[in-house]
């Protein structure tokens, strides 16, 4: 793909009447959620819906495949649901597959829902997505938006493991939790104040997880944190123009004296916040090349910030790159960890190499982009060639603010390349 031109999607999925806010692949399926609370379950074989239902009263924040038949959804309505999704012998779900029109999008009475197996009240004040891996769920604490709660899925229900997770460091204010990720018994947290933290969640006998890493690496709120699938590293992006690569270590950051937290409390749903619309301005100049808490060649330390390295041993990122575009959200890594993808506030999707965070591709949605997702290809011994292709293809999904979902494919080779030039990752 030439950077001077736009790639052509291999498929365009139409159906949502509101901006797409969440996407998640699983095997030959894709699920998508929108700003009005609707969920679409798509087949990548037919590229048509298998089921459509109104899952939440407000925007979908998270979609998580817990296993091949259970889908977790989180909404801005402070609810988390677990649905059972099944197909019959003919590949039918028994649910509606007719997309709602814009005139009836808020009247879901004609759309039966899948079997709801579990419901939980959560704190969605932050717009923070939940994180899930191998039966563990991380989410913002129900009572304090600057803390994290860790739960475990056991016998068809979530049980609290820890409910008061935050960096216990003297004199710091992290702001609210913005994004979460779990990888290899490590909990990664991004904060409103620009900090990121890593906690060790392997020892259940402790009354709080060990803090392994803490650094303020952004001058704006952190929007995304994602762990590398094989390396002990993670990357973060924020409302500023930096993509920062961090280490994941087993060190212990000294914390102030801690008292054992109180047991988890079952409180009422937090009050709904007042939502203020902010006009998007793609012409914004990128912020100053400023990173707090560490030294990076070519970047200046923000005035007035005193770095106390003795409080944060080895809390220094591996790399930081100013990509000159503010507002990098929905950051994703492909299954091999070779590529980084972001959805920009300027409506552009950007692909970077992981190793040196160099830009390899830029393309955009006409009406703006809300979220992006990579698939994880699997091997297949099926006799159905269409199903085999859907399972083994490396998909990219781009959710637009116009309600459309664009599907692209990455051609897999020795170097994941196609064609000539710097940008060879997207099939035309």
Curated annotation (Swiss-Prot):
Keywords, ordered alphabetically: Chromatin regulator, Nucleus, Repeat, WD repeat
SMART domains named in the record: WD40
Record has Membrane as a keyword: no
Subcellular location, record wording: Nucleus
Binding partners and assembly: Component of the ASTRA chromatin remodeling machinery complex.
Family the UniProt entry places it in: Belongs to the WD repeat ASA1 family.
Entry annotated with the keyword Nucleus: yes
One of the GO biological process terms: chromatin organization
Role summary: Component of the ASTRA complex involved in chromatin remodeling.
Pfam entry (one): WD40
UniProt cross-references to InterPro entries, sorted A to Z: WD40/YVTN_repeat-like_dom_sf, WD40_repeat_dom_sf, WD40_rpt
Protein source organism: Yarrowia lipolytica (strain CLIB 122 / E 150)
Protein name stated in the entry: ASTRA-associated protein 1
WD repeat residue intervals: 15-52, 55-93, 122-163, 171-209, 217-259, 323-362, 364-418
Region (Disordered): 250-295
This protein's GO CC annotations: nucleus
